[in-house]
Amino acid sequence: MWMLAVALLHSISHGILTENFLSHHAFPSLLLSLHFSHPSVFSEDLHASLYFVNASLQEVVFASTTGTLVPCPAAGIPPVTLRWYLATGEEIYDVPGIRHVHPNGTLQIFPFPPSSFNNLIHDNTYYCTAENPSGKIRSQDVHIKAVLREPYTVRVEDQKAMRGNVAVFKCIIPSSVEAYITVVSWEKDTVSLVSGPRFLITSTGALYILDVQNEDGLYNYRCITRHRYTGETRQSNSARLFVSDPANSAPSILDGFDHRKAMAGQRVELPCKASGHPTPKYRWLKDNIPWEPDSRFRQTVTGLLIENTRPSDSGNYVCEVWNNYGTAEMIGRLYVKQPLKATISPRKVKSSVGSQVSLSCSVTGTEDQELSWYRNGEIINPGNNVRITGINRENLIMDGMAKSDGGAYQCFVRKDKMSAQDYVQVILEDGTPKIISAFSEKVVSPGEPVSLMCNVKGTPLPTITWTLDEDPIVKDGSHRISQIITSEGNVVSYLNISNTQVRDGGVYRCTANNSAGVVLYQARINVRGPASIRPMKNITAIAGRDTYIHCRVIGYPYYSIKWYKNSNLLPFNHRQVAFENNGTLKLSDVQKEVDEGEYTCNVLVQPQLSTSQSVHVTVKVPPFIQPFEFPRFSIGQRVFIPCVVVSGDLPITITWQKDGRPIPASLGVTIDNIDFTSSLRISNLSLMHNGNYTCIARNDAAAVEHQSQLIVRVPPRFVVQPSDQDGIYGKAVILNCSAEGYPVPTIVWKYSKGAGVPQFQPIALNGRIQLLTNGSLLIKHVLEEDSGYYLCKVSNDVGADVSKSMYLTVKIPAMITSYPNTTLATQGQKKEMSCTAHGEKPIIVRWEKEDRIINPEMSRYLVSTKEVGDEVISTLQILPTVREDSGFFSCHAINSYGEDRGIIQLTVQEPPDPPEIEIREVRARSIALRWTMGFDGNSPITGYDIECKNKSDSWDSVQRTKDVSPQLNQATIIDLHPSSTYNIRMYAKNRIGKSEASNELTITTDEAAPDGPPQDVQLEPISSQSIRVTWKAPKKHLQNGIIRGYQIGYREYSAGGNFQFNIISIDTTGDSEVYTLNNLKKFTQYGMVVQACNRAGIGPSSQEIITTTLEDVPSCPPGNVQATATSPETISISWSTLAKETLNGILQGFRVIYWANLLDGELGEIRNVTTTQPSLELDGLEKYTNYSIQVLAFTRAGDGVRSEQIFTRTKEDVPGPPAGVKAAASSASTVFVSWLPPLKLNGIIRKYTVFCSHPYPTVISEFEASPDSFSYRIPNLSRNRQYSVWVVAVTAAGRGNSSEIITVEPLAKAPARILTFSGTVTTPWMKDIVLPCKAVGDPAPTVKWMKDSNGTPSLVMIDGRRSIFSNGSFVIRTVKAEDSGYYSCVASNNWGSDEIILNLQVQVPPDQPRLTVSKTTSSSITLSWIPGDNGGSSIRGYILQYSEDNSEQWGSFPISPSERSYRLETLKCGTWYKFTLTAQNGVGPGRISEIIEAKTLGKEPQFSKEQELFASINTTRVRLNLIGWNDGGCPITSFTLEYRPFGTTVWTTAQRTSLSKSYILYDLQEATWYELQMRVCNSAGCAEKQAKFATLNYDGSTIPPLIKSVVQSEEGLATNEGLKMLVTISCILVGVLLLFVMLLIVRRRRREQRLKRLRDAKSLAEMLMSKNTRTSDTLNKQQQTLRMHIDIPRAQLLIEERDTMETIDDRSTVLLTDADFGETSKQKSLTVTHTVHYQSVSQATGPLVDVSDARPGTNPTTRRSAKTGPTARNRYASQWTLNRPHPTISAHTLTTDWRLPTPRPAGSVDKESDSYSVSPSQDTDRARSSMVSTESASSTYEELARAYEHAKMEEQLRHAKFTITECFISDTSSEQLTAGTNDYTDSLTSSTPSESGICRFTASPPKPQDGGRVMNMAVPKAHRPGDLVHLPPYLRMDFLLNRGAQGASRDLGLGQACLEPQKSRTLKRPTVLEPIPMEASSTREAQSWQPGAVATLPQREGAELGQAAKMSSSQESLLDSRGHLKGNNPYAKSYTLV
């Protein structure tokens, strides 16, 4: 079957498909696809592509000396074939050595000499093509042009300008090379100019000099050009600028433009510059419409700048210029071209064969363009199925696309020399029909319906037909055909047979065909029934081809099918093939003689039955033409060509065609046909007969053709003949010659020189002589020797050559043949200049001087002319020459054919002008000069002489430097001395002579770094981190200027080390200097050097000196501290030693600090042990106790840092005896035993054992009680029998000691007894507390509770908060502070009673600490504080909070409870901070302290008055000296500098973040006053400085000061004087008024500050008094001396005001003493209390405090709220500062009330205490007077003095005396001052003098106590000599000092008054002791007060403010009473300050 398909395809491919071929043959199950075959130029592979790599390449210009390489701008994938063509379409070829195309498509043109120039190669248009299977594209036209090297010169002309105006220099370039030349730079003398403020180089190459100055005329100006392609540079001549003084003149345009072309999107500058005075103004118009500035248009110094140009910007631009004296305008046209752009749409075209494709090409950038379409590189012309529509042929429409139409389509747009293109690839899919699915072969029975389907795909939609055994299906009732089109575009056809018959069997075929091809499918349908053969049609076969014969069998089944010919079974040869299964016979390569005949098909139906049918095959032979060709013919000849058909069946028809069409009769062609031949005859051949001739032969079998081309050759002939011509010398001439012929003839020119007999020679073509494409000869530059005969010869190898000659006559225009380019003349002498002219006569010669014709009337000029041969010689004489004659002279020669000129530069030489000398740079030992050469006398400068001398010397002793090179314009004078003044001048010399002396300069050299080191450098260590360095300045002659400061270099000294020095810079203070280095390493050896500094730098360093810082305490704790309990009383401790770098000295040992952590949360006594070893065993410890342990190292300087606490518990031991035992009978047989736990548990109590025994007999009973039980009932005892009872505690270590043995007897009438013990009960506040009272007895006793109130017990109040349980316990809920006190429980029955007393102590949160500032630095603040009352619970720690001023953000730090100071680091310099402190105890955090404020050291910057701001000033620069800025102790954060010309409003800003030593202001205006302002900031603030300065004139002179002169008339003098007087008086009055207002404001502010402090004190007083108020009896107070105490750092100021009398009535008394806060549980030593009552005379308004470290306007001691005071105080006296009250009112009555609650036992010693009394006002709603304590840890005398000064400023304290105590360190002072202090917290706050300074006596404020509790109050008394042993050391010494100074009587009185018991509670008040001044004893006697006595206190005269008073404590009384004797105190001295 496939063989049949191949045969069918072969037949169709040859175009021979007979009409009945398919209808007579059946092919079972055969699928055939028939394609119309066409040559394809486009692949269907979508991955193939073409593209451009440089589509913008349109022009290549190169130099003939370099050649060029031009790559083809197209490429593609897969790789493409690249070819180059000329614009005419001719493919180029290689020309050896001239042109070559590389394999990669690069076109190379080699370098060539001018004589080898060829237009076709070196100046032509090319294009290249790229071709691959995707198609073929062509590039845009590329114009390749070679530029020949041509000599040229450029020149610049002199210009004139007015000073302050503008000058424009232009570089004049010859027009022949102007397109290739670019101005690259300008030079001023030999220095290249750079565009700047005054010199601008425009885009066109012009030089603008703005703001012309006189010195601009002293230079020569030249332009430098470069050839764009050859790279050659040219330098123009020198031109000068003549500067004149400004004169009123109308504007004159100096620079403009005629026309300018630009591409859209570019930047264009339209120049317009004019000169005139006054300076003209400019205005631009476009198309006569004023121009409005916008973002694209901007008027600049040079003209109008247009950014991003658009085509709409094209137009006429007018630049109007005007001033007061006239106008001018410049008109130019701007052409903005839009780049050509072509765009094809759609971008992707994918279609099918036969479809329509439309392409559109849109063009931008032009309106009148030429558009053409190309397909695969070939131009597309309309016709057939191609249409090109649109106004500009922009639409391409192609119908019925064939496969060959696919490929690359391009749209080309051309306009002038621009072109653009775009391309798109058109992909054509294969639209040939394809069978997607179809029916299959099947067998059916008669009557069975059958449906056959064919699904076909193709483009365009195919047509489907059905056949049965090659016969069309006839539609009838049982045969129906239908078809549908699916969504995929497929055509589905159905053949439905409803009632199948046997005749319906056979081969069914569906055939689909469209314009792309035909496809068919066939399969056999067998219908059961008797087999038979359907009649077959005869077949015509073509000889030489294959033929298929199908046997049309119907019916099924059958046995076989066989073919016979002439009764012979086929096949019988190799060309015959029989397919038995489907009945098909194939005849290959049919032969007429053999294969023609009758063929029989025999079908075997049954074994013995067969049927047959015959078919006749006729074989026809197609024609065959014998090939023929046209020979070479020429025009006019005769032609005969035969066409012979050598084979083929007759009849044969023969026809002829020309170029595919029938031959028209008008051509005169004769055709003769005879049988199988045909001939073509032409009698007279002409060009019309050119073409392709085709002979076509046809018969019944086929039609064949043969084609041949006829080419008619034409001999050459002239179209334009040459004729004689004239040519002008130097101009171009074209010798015309044009010819035609075929092939195209070749034209050759020959030349014969002269007018004689011609002897023609070939002409060598070159760049000057070129052959044009039409054959004419072009001579670009006619020379005189070109005159002669020229012959034009034409040939093309057809016929004879033709030629024609002509004569060229060369006319010579006037030419200057000889003249001097340059010539020299000496000023004052005669000068002659000649020039020679040549050319056609007559010739006229004239002379010009710089465009001015020289006339005979000019007296100094004489012109003479003479003829010599064919030349004319003209001579110009100048008599005599002057400077102005220098310049350009020109001689002009003119005749009828042209003119010429020769330019002669005449230089008149003379001695030069002196140079203008200026300073370029001044250094310490050299001066750099720069000079501007004036007029050089038109003779090169041969050298310069420079003279220099000291200012004080004469020019006779000058140092001279001769013959400085003339190439230099600057020099440096060296070997000068720094900071010295010199005079300098110079001379210029040329060949003519020497100039005058230049201007004289006076210059002072800069300072140089000192040459000598500082002298006498000494080091003195003053602390562990400080070393004082002292030195003296270097020797005077080595200072090299003024010493501004020093640098100290220091480093850790190491003998072999190489450590770098740390540098510190300081300012100088004099010849002797001192500086202290701080923050050094402790106990470290340092090496130090000192260097002196001046403005120039740093001098040599001094010799290194070594010293060591002092020893200090260690900075780190010992490490790895470990502790282990070894026994119940010992702990073993070990640690590691410190590193050497942290010891800070010589290790003396280690100190171990330890204390017990008690069970109640309290801390035990702090102890310390020292050792020299890194281990220690602590013994004598409490058993089973948790210990805190810290270790520190100490040196000779003291203790170092403690280690972190570690905790270790000692081991368990047997417990101690129970602390107490009670036993009582509850009945006749039962007793109760109660006990207290042991005081020393020594472990965990496991149980208690109760022992009970009776002696007769001795029986001991043991009873066990649980460890948490403290009572036991012993039953079953004998009545009225005594028993011994004791108790033992038991731990894991065993039984402890037994308690005391008590006896008890069971009784029937048992009296009431309380088993609970008396004692102290401690509880936190706001908790519920149960006070137990367990009572026994028979009958059961009754219990009542009482509380001690003012010494009198009273029953407790029972309410909702207080109740008594049935067991006798007293319950207090939510216990408060006022619940503290002594409670009594009384139990009673009929037989007795018992009582216990419980002391309830309520723990509250701690009171607020008193926070002060003790030290500040620039980055840190050290705070100290005194803790307040601990609230009955030890302080557990502190929380310090801080915030920057004006900030809401607070930070916090936890602080150990043992600390009393804290240092905050890394703070901002010079900044205010706020601080608060909160204490915490076991109850919780206490009240926050008052907010205090402190400021770190540092202030805002300031400029030193001793420093000069301006270091140097010249014409355009100012150097500022910034060394004078002092940073104020804080680093500079910003530095802003602004300056502006005086009188203007715009500031020029230069901001710097750091200060350097100097700063230079550049580009200032010459001779102008400026305003300057600086702003320097640091973290503390900002400072500003303003100044004015003036720049110098260009000659170095100064300008007048800023003074406005007023010209006044005589009449106006008097009026002006009066006006001045009036203004002066007004100013004075305004000044006085302002001063008065300022004084009022200052006074008001001070008053407000005082009032604020008073208000703060008022608030504090209210707080204190609200806590301390207690009711008491009224006391009378005797007259006292007013005292005020001020706390200052470690100092006490006792402010004493005498002669103050007051009478005060006190009704409300507050009792505050040290004894109030002692241990209340210990009652062994009761003290007598002396209470002094004092009532404030007025409302308190504020405390008097030390504000030396506080911020102005703030009060560091302000308190806002009240809190419970402390319960324990240091025994040292606190110093209280009294507030300042209002003026006193009328006198009040004082009464005295003495209370002695408990007499002192005989022989007892009073407990030492201090007593204070603060009394509130009677009006409790108003603020109370209070006393405030402050403290600081600082001990400097400066702070003391500052506090003293603050106190003296207070009005009431101006006449006060101040007493202070100065402390010295002693070995025993620390121990003495801390003796007897048991409280851990207070021991840390004791004011022990640790170093020399001012003693500090401070303590916490007192805690308020119950008014009724006076058991522990102390009474001030005079100590007897025997009592001194009980006093602290300082009181002992003070008492001894006071003995003998009126002490006896007063001491006695005081002591008696205090100790004598009284029956009445009202006693006389003892005399108050007064302080005794150092200079004399007090003479005041004590007044005796009687009960009820009344005293009147007089008011102070004129007092504005009231008095303040402070009560004396016991210590103060002693201090007041002691005598001030010298030398007795071992560590203190006292002073009195007045």
Curated annotation (Swiss-Prot):
Q: Where is the signal peptide?
A: 1-18
Which cysteines form disulfides? 72-128, 171-223, 272-319, 361-411, 454-510, 551-601, 643-695, 737-792, 835-891, 1333-1385
* Disordered, as annotated region: 1744-1833, 1882-1908, 2001-2034
Subcellular localization: Cell membrane; Cell projection, Axon; Synapse
What tissue specificity does the UniProt entry give? SDK1, SDK2, DSCAM and DSCAML1 are expressed in non-overlapping subsets of interneurons and retinal ganglion cells (RGCs) that form synapses in distinct inner plexiform layer (IPL) sublaminae.
Span-the-membrane segments of this chain are 1622-1642
Q: Which GO terms describe its biological process?
A: axon guidance; camera-type eye photoreceptor cell differentiation; dendrite morphogenesis; dendrite self-avoidance; dendritic spine development; homophilic cell adhesion via plasma membrane adhesion molecules; locomotory behavior; negative regulation of cell adhesion
User: Which part of the chain is the Ig-like C2-type domain?
Assistant: 39-145, 151-242, 251-321, 339-427, 433-526, 530-618, 622-711, 716-809, 813-909, 1311-1403
Q: What does this protein do?
A: Cell adhesion molecule that plays a role in neuronal self-avoidance. Promotes repulsion between specific neuronal processes of either the same cell or the same subtype of cells. Mediates within retinal amacrine and ganglion cell subtypes both isoneuronal self-avoidance for creating an orderly dendritic arborization and heteroneuronal self-avoidance to maintain the mosaic spacing between amacrine and ganglion cell bodies. Receptor for netrin required for axon guidance independently of and in collaboration with the receptor DCC.
Residues with an annotated glycan are 54, 104, 496, 513, 538, 582, 684, 692, 736, 774, 821, 950, 1168, 1186, 1276, 1297, 1367, 1514
Those parts of the protein on the Cytoplasmic side are 1643-2034
- UniProt name for this protein: Cell adhesion molecule DSCAM
Per UniProt, the ranges with Polar residues bias are 1882-1891
Organism of derivation? Gallus gallus
The UniProt entry's GO CC annotations, sorted and at most eight, read: dendrite; growth cone; neuronal cell body; plasma membrane; synapse
Q: What is the annotated quaternary arrangement, including any partners? A: Homodimer; mediates homophilic interactions to promote cell adhesion.
| InterPro entries, alphabetized | DSCAM/DSCAML_C, FN3_dom, FN3_sf, Ig-like_dom, Ig-like_dom_sf, Ig-like_fold, Ig_I-set, Ig_sub
